[in-house]
Amino acid sequence: MAINIIAQLEQEESARLLAARAIPDFRPGDTLRVNVKIKEGERERVQAYEGVCIARAGTGVHESFTVRKISFGEGVERLFPLLSPSIESIEVKRRGVVRRAKLYYLRDRRGKSARIAERAGGPKASASTEA
C-alpha cells in the first residue's frame, strides 16, 4: 500500500513538472542542445551543451538522458536528469536513425564510423507523422 502511495506521488510530481516546462520528444540518436544554468560565485549564466543523445533511462521523476560530444578530440559524456531545475531548455537540432535504445558503441568509434544518418522530416517532424 505504501509503495503505491509513493508511486502515485511521484507520478503527480512528474506530471506537474512536465506541465511547467516544454520538453521536446527526443530519442537516442538525436542531436540535442541542452542549455544548462551554471552558477559561478554570485553570477548565474546559461551554457549550451550540444551532442548526440546516446541513452535515456528511468521513468517519471527519475528519468535521465546521456549526451555525448567530442570536445578538443576527447569524448565527453554528461548525464542530465530530465526534470532538473538546472536545465533551462532542450532543443532537438537533428533527428537520427538508429536501431538501438543505448548507443554505447559510439564510445569506441571515431570520425565517419561514428556518424548517425538523419531521419526524414528533420527536427520539426513529430513521432505521429512518421510511419
UniProtKB/Swiss-Prot annotation:
Biological process, per Gene Ontology: translation
Where does the source fall among the domains of life? Bacteria
Q: Does the keyword Membrane apply?
A: no
Q: Name one Pfam family in it.
A: Ribosomal_L19
Query: InterPro entries recorded for this chain?
Result: Ribosomal_bL19 (IPR001857), Ribosomal_bL19_CS (IPR018257), Ribosomal_bL19_sf (IPR038657), Translation_prot_SH3-like_sf (IPR008991)
Q: Which UniProt keywords apply?
A: Ribonucleoprotein, Ribosomal protein
- A molecular function GO annotation: structural constituent of ribosome
Mention any one GO cellular component term assigned to this protein in its UniProt record.
cytosolic large ribosomal subunit
Gene3D superfamilies from the UniProt entry: 2.30.30.790
Q: Where is this region: Disordered?
A: 112-131
Q: Give a yes or no for keyword DNA repair in this entry.
A: no
Which PANTHER family does UniProt cross-reference here? LARGE RIBOSOMAL SUBUNIT PROTEIN BL19M, RIBOSOMAL PROTEIN L19
Function as written in the Swiss-Prot or TrEMBL entry: This protein is located at the 30S-50S ribosomal subunit interface and may play a role in the structure and function of the aminoacyl-tRNA binding site.
Family, similarity comment: Belongs to the bacterial ribosomal protein bL19 family.
Q: What is this protein called?
A: Large ribosomal subunit protein bL19
